[in-house]
Amino acid sequence: MNPSAPSYPMASLYVGDLHPDVTEAMLYEKFSPAGPILSIRVCRDMITRRSLGYAYVNFQQPADAERALDTMNFDVIKGKPVRIMWSQRDPSLRKSGVGNIFIKNLDKSIDNKALYDTFSAFGNILSCKVVCDENGSKGYGFVHFETQEAAERAIEKMNGMLLNDRKVFVGRFKSRKEREAELGARAKEFTNVYIKNFGEDMDDERLKELFGKFGPALSVKVMTDESGKSKGFGFVSFERHEDAQKAVDEMNGKELNGKQIYVGRAQKKVERQTELKRKFEQMKQDRITRYQGVNLYVKNLDDGIDDERLRKEFSPFGTITSAKVMMEGGRSKGFGFVCFSSPEEATKAVTEMNGRIVATKPLYVALAQRKEERQAHLTNQYMQRMASVRAVPNPVINPYQPAPPSGYFMAAIPQTQNRAAYYPPSQIAQLRPSPRWTAQGARPHPFQNMPGAIRPAAPRPPFSTMRPASSQVPRVMSTQRVANTSTQTMGPRPAAAAAAATPAVRTVPQYKYAAGVRNPQQHLNAQPQVTMQQPAVHVQGQEPLTASMLASAPPQEQKQMLGERLFPLIQAMHPSLAGKITGMLLEIDNSELLHMLESPESLRSKVDEAVAVLQAHQAKEAAQKAVNSATGVPTV
């Protein structure tokens, strides 16, 4: 964005709890009635490009953002009520806990909106959330007020009150570290004792008799089932911590009716789960450490290889502690694991056995990795590869193969598509970043100075990537687009033939017109090239457009300049669909659009394809609406 443009620190909204299929266009339709929007961005996973369930909507005016927050919070989009709050970019303010309260023992029927409506009487709410899982509400939630005073008023008035006939607890929000510290302090001063494994013949009186010798007890209870039969465990609550500690020390592990009983501090369910989880994680970490560097992963196994054969093949390299072929339904899955007693033996086995043919197949042998490690490693490799590809403007290719223009990437390597924010056309003029390249001249083509060389045609992206645009909602303009060259056959065209076909040679600058891609500049020591006169694209009533004019314009203006010249031509062919088709065509690369402006046949071909795509989309929408109306499902 232009640094001189005004900033709107409080005109940005966070929109959460989104359905995975919600797009920027849907959010634009939803929020645009509140006021002019600068941009919309649905946050997505870098690799899978799936929605993360939240988005940011940036308004031009804070008053419009406030109106949207007041009137649209908890509105339903694609069957899910969305949660809107002010975007707070400073994490210290979000995590400080100031103004944040915790509410528990909530009725299952209380949702985000009901909680918001209940607590909004005490002050301005920044965020409000009932914690849910796949089964619905978990019975607790959080409300973050703008001020600490509002939070204290809510605690004072609402703690112990009835909400939907349930007495709720309302208190100051405490971080996990604070809660664990409090639990630890309380645990040291426990008075409640848990006893288990004492059999079915135990009752309250007998349990009191057993533990009464340690000190006065407030309560004694043996837990029973519906028939009154003991469940084998119970509780004794002492008056003093010292008596409880003495009972645990003396009674834990003693035999009672031929059974060894357990006596310990009574724990809440959350405490027990936390402790078990911690023990499990510790065991898991110990196991990982123990097998680090000694466990091998073996794949591409022949179907006839079993555990014994696998052990036999690897036994020459050292002492094997375990060998296992993974099976499913009695059949080998084609891979297994071999664990050695030392890392040296495992390393030797990898060196000797990787690639060796056993039975009928060459084995793949490597150190075993946990799933998380493997995924992290693959992701890291992928990101490094993408970074290296982006760093090289033109990958080294066969000199006789037509080279892609500078700024394009070879399609043989998969590319991530970094989706940009959604910019309405009314705001594009305000979002003009400075050009990232010199506009004095185009980068010379690698074949330019070779006499008689074949000049490759610029690759044209397949039209199937275009999507129909709504007349009310503009297209999402991606700031980084990768040309797909693998699906397009590029026909070589001799320079002489090209010169004969056209009165003047059109030299299109080898740039990918995208705001997020840094185009390479000419080398300082490069030989000066003869600048050939570029033909201008003439559209009646418009200023002539040349490739150099386009290159010197800011990125957002480039599409506008092209759109202004495309629209009258398309309007002459399809007056009612001109706006939609123009928006669809503007997703094509600028060099291709220039060619279409010069070639009426090429333009007509693309327009016909766009009309076909648009008609197919409209037919699909009509069919979906018919299905929804027949089944009574409301359309969003």
Curated annotation (Swiss-Prot):
Residues with N6-methyllysine modification: K299
Domain PABC: 542-619
Keyword vocabulary terms for this entry: Acetylation, Cell projection, Cytoplasm, Methylation, mRNA processing, mRNA splicing, Nonsense-mediated mRNA decay, Nucleus, Phosphoprotein, Repeat, RNA-binding, Spliceosome
SMART domains assigned: PolyA, RRM, RRM_1
Residues recorded with modification Phosphoserine: S315
Dimethylated arginine modifications at: R493
A GO term from the CC aspect: dendrite
InterPro entries, alphabetized: Nucleotide-bd_a/b_plait_sf, PABP-dom, PABP_1234, PABP_HYD_C, PABP_RRM1, RBD_domain_sf, RRM2_I_PABPs, RRM_dom
Annotated spans, CSDE1-binding: 166-289
Residues modified as N6-acetyllysine: K512
Domain RRM: 11-89, 99-175, 191-268, 294-370
Pfam families: MLLE, RRM_1
Organism superkingdom: Eukaryota
Subcellular location: Cytoplasm; Cytoplasm, Stress granule; Nucleus; Cell projection, Lamellipodium
Positions of disulphide bridges: none
Phosphothreonine PTM positions: T319
Modifications the protein undergoes after translation, according to the UniProt entry: Phosphorylated by MAPKAPK2.
GO MF entries: mRNA binding; poly(A) binding; poly(U) RNA binding
Residues annotated with N-acetylmethionine modification: M1
Coiled-coil portions: none
Record note on quaternary structure: May form homodimers. Component of a multisubunit autoregulatory ribonucleoprotein complex (ARC), at least composed of IGF2BP1, PABPC1 and CSDE1. Directly interacts with IGF2BP1. Part of a complex associated with the FOS mCRD domain and consisting of HNRPD, SYNCRIP, PAIP1 and CSDE1/UNR. Interacts with PAIP1 and PAIP2 (via the PABPC1-interacting motifs PAM1 and PAM2). Interacts with PAIP1 with a 1:1 stoichiometry and with PAIP2 with a 1:2 stoichiometry. The interaction with CSDE1 is direct and RNA-independent. Found in a mRNP complex with YBX2. Interacts with TENT2/GLD2.
Recorded family membership: Belongs to the polyadenylate-binding protein type-1 family.
Known function: Binds the poly(A) tail of mRNA, including that of its own transcript, and regulates processes of mRNA metabolism such as pre-mRNA splicing and mRNA stability. Its function in translational initiation regulation can either be enhanced by PAIP1 or repressed by PAIP2. Can probably bind to cytoplasmic RNA sequences other than poly(A) in vivo. Binds to N6-methyladenosine (m6A)-containing mRNAs and contributes to MYC stability by binding to m6A-containing MYC mRNAs. Involved in translationally coupled mRNA turnover.
Notes concerning its domains: The RNA-binding domains RRM1 and RRM2 and the C-terminus (last 138 amino acids) regions interact respectively with the PABPC1-interacting motif-1 (PAM1) and -2 (PAM2) of PAIP1, respectively.
Protein name from the UniProt record: Polyadenylate-binding protein 1
Native source organism of the sequence: Mus musculus (Mouse)
Gene field: Pabpc1
